[in-house]
């Protein structure tokens, strides 16, 4: 039975060094988030087959690989978001706002995809643990049972000898079952380690969202401060123009008064000379 390709959810490695600019990181993160969501949907589909007739070692192997590769994709996206936060901001305040909004939207999408993935991870872990519990409970012979029955065995009849051989066959089957149980327990430990990784990613994401909010507040404060400075400069220019106009008016009055005084003096001198 085919369970779908696993490589489609892995981020294809670049053939060479890629430019780490804002837009390329945004694009890579968006693609990763989409793949995480797609992988989560397929994990749910595989999980629904656990404990049914479709359950098999191949299904569990695919489920484990898909879950682990998705976890690695989430860790890669987390590192890219950290790198995104370390890029220098553009000079334009409007471009700064636009980039902040893009990052905020991206982190919200990542948080949502990550939350859905972790919910499915926990459900897979619960199902695997239930499966192991059923397998242990259904084991035909425990080690203590075999030891006790071997002590009670008597070879007085051919029939009892056949019964002992049958028990040994059952014990061999049980050993095989126990080996499968050990494999599942190993897979569960890996799954729980991946769940802890996702928990750490959530902590990092919460910190980045907090820093993002502080940065947006800082940008808005700078924009408001610039607007205040512009308003103050405009007010000062208006005042300067007012004072300059007032000064010119005073100058005109002074010139007019001086003109009148000079005229009066000229008239007085002219009259006196006669």
Curated annotation (Swiss-Prot):
<keyword id="KW-0007">Acetylation</keyword>
<feature type="transmembrane region" description="Helical; Anchor for type IV membrane protein">
    <location>
        <begin position="251"/>
        <end position="271"/>
    </location>
</feature>
<feature type="modified residue" description="Phosphoserine">
    <location>
        <position position="139"/>
    </location>
</feature>
<feature type="modified residue" description="Phosphoserine">
    <location>
        <position position="225"/>
    </location>
</feature>
<feature type="topological domain" description="Vesicular">
    <location>
        <begin position="272"/>
        <end position="274"/>
    </location>
</feature>
<protein>
    <recommendedName>
        <fullName>Syntaxin-12</fullName>
    </recommendedName>
</protein>
<dbReference type="GO" id="GO:0005654">
    <property type="term" value="C:nucleoplasm"/>
</dbReference>
<feature type="region of interest" description="Disordered">
    <location>
        <begin position="128"/>
        <end position="147"/>
    </location>
</feature>
<feature type="region of interest" description="Disordered">
    <location>
        <begin position="1"/>
        <end position="20"/>
    </location>
</feature>
<dbReference type="GO" id="GO:0006886">
    <property type="term" value="P:intracellular protein transport"/>
</dbReference>
<dbReference type="GO" id="GO:0031083">
    <property type="term" value="C:BLOC-1 complex"/>
</dbReference>
<dbReference type="InterPro" id="IPR006012">
    <property type="entry name" value="Syntaxin/epimorphin_CS"/>
</dbReference>
<dbReference type="GO" id="GO:0031201">
    <property type="term" value="C:SNARE complex"/>
</dbReference>
<feature type="modified residue" description="Phosphoserine">
    <location>
        <position position="218"/>
    </location>
</feature>
<keyword id="KW-1133">Transmembrane helix</keyword>
<keyword id="KW-0597">Phosphoprotein</keyword>
<dbReference type="GO" id="GO:0032456">
    <property type="term" value="P:endocytic recycling"/>
</dbReference>
<dbReference type="Pfam" id="PF14523">
    <property type="entry name" value="Syntaxin_2"/>
</dbReference>
<keyword id="KW-0472">Membrane</keyword>
<dbReference type="InterPro" id="IPR010989">
    <property type="entry name" value="SNARE"/>
</dbReference>
<dbReference type="GO" id="GO:0031901">
    <property type="term" value="C:early endosome membrane"/>
</dbReference>
<dbReference type="GO" id="GO:0033344">
    <property type="term" value="P:cholesterol efflux"/>
</dbReference>
<comment type="similarity">
    <text>Belongs to the syntaxin family.</text>
</comment>
<dbReference type="InterPro" id="IPR006011">
    <property type="entry name" value="Syntaxin_N"/>
</dbReference>
<dbReference type="GO" id="GO:0045121">
    <property type="term" value="C:membrane raft"/>
</dbReference>
<dbReference type="GO" id="GO:0055037">
    <property type="term" value="C:recycling endosome"/>
</dbReference>
<dbReference type="InterPro" id="IPR045242">
    <property type="entry name" value="Syntaxin"/>
</dbReference>
<dbReference type="GO" id="GO:0000045">
    <property type="term" value="P:autophagosome assembly"/>
</dbReference>
<comment type="subunit">
    <text>Associates with the BLOC-1 complex. Interacts with BLOC1S6. Interacts with NAPA and SNAP23. Identified in a complex containing STX6, STX12, VAMP4 and VTI1A. Interacts with GRIPAP1. Forms a complex with GRIP1, GRIA2 and NSG1; controls the intracellular fate of AMPAR and the endosomal sorting of the GRIA2 subunit toward recycling and membrane targeting. Interacts with NSG1. Interacts with TPC1. Interacts (via N-terminus) with VPS13B.</text>
</comment>
<feature type="modified residue" description="N-acetylserine">
    <location>
        <position position="2"/>
    </location>
</feature>
<feature type="modified residue" description="Phosphoserine">
    <location>
        <position position="142"/>
    </location>
</feature>
<keyword id="KW-0175">Coiled coil</keyword>
<keyword id="KW-0967">Endosome</keyword>
<keyword id="KW-0333">Golgi apparatus</keyword>
<keyword id="KW-0653">Protein transport</keyword>
<dbReference type="GO" id="GO:0005484">
    <property type="term" value="F:SNAP receptor activity"/>
</dbReference>
<keyword id="KW-0813">Transport</keyword>
<dbReference type="GO" id="GO:0000139">
    <property type="term" value="C:Golgi membrane"/>
</dbReference>
<keyword id="KW-0812">Transmembrane</keyword>
<feature type="coiled-coil region">
    <location>
        <begin position="33"/>
        <end position="130"/>
    </location>
</feature>
<dbReference type="GO" id="GO:0055038">
    <property type="term" value="C:recycling endosome membrane"/>
</dbReference>
<dbReference type="Pfam" id="PF05739">
    <property type="entry name" value="SNARE"/>
</dbReference>
């Amino acid at each position: 039975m085919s369970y779908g390709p696993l490589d489609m959810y892995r981020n294809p490695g670049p053939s060479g060094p890629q430019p780490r600019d804002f837009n390329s990181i945004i694009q890579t993160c968006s693609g990763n988030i989409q793949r995480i969501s797609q992988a989560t949907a397929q994990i749910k589909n595989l999980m629904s087959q656990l404990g049914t007739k479709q359950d098999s070692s191949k299904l569990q192997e695919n489920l484990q690989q898909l879950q682990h590769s998705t976890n690695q994709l989430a860790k890669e996206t987390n590192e890219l978001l950290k790198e995104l936060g370390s890029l220098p901001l553009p000079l334009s305040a409007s471009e700064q706002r636009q980039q902040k909004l893009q990052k905020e939207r991206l982190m919200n999408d990542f948080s949502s995809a990550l939350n859905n993935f972790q919910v499915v991870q926990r459900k897979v872990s619960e199902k695997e643990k239930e499966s192991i519990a059923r397998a242990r409970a259904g084991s035909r012979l425990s080690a203590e049972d075999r030891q006790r029955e071997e002590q009670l065995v008597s070879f007085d009849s051919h029939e009892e000898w056949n019964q002992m051989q049958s028990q040994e066959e059952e014990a061999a089957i049980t050993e095989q079952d126990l080996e499968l149980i050990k494999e599942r327990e190993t897979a569960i430990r890996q799954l729980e380690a991946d769940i802890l990784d996702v928990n750490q990613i959530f902590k990092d994401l919460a910190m980045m969202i907090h820093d993002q909010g502080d940065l947006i507040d800082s940008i808005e404060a700078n924009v408001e401060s610039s607007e205040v400075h512009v308003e103050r400069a405009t007010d000062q220019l208006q005042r300067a123009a007012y004072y300059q106009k007032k000064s010119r008016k005073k100058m005109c009055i002074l010139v007019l008064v001086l003109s009148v005084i000079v005229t009066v003096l000229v008239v007085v001198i002219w009259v006196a000379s006669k």
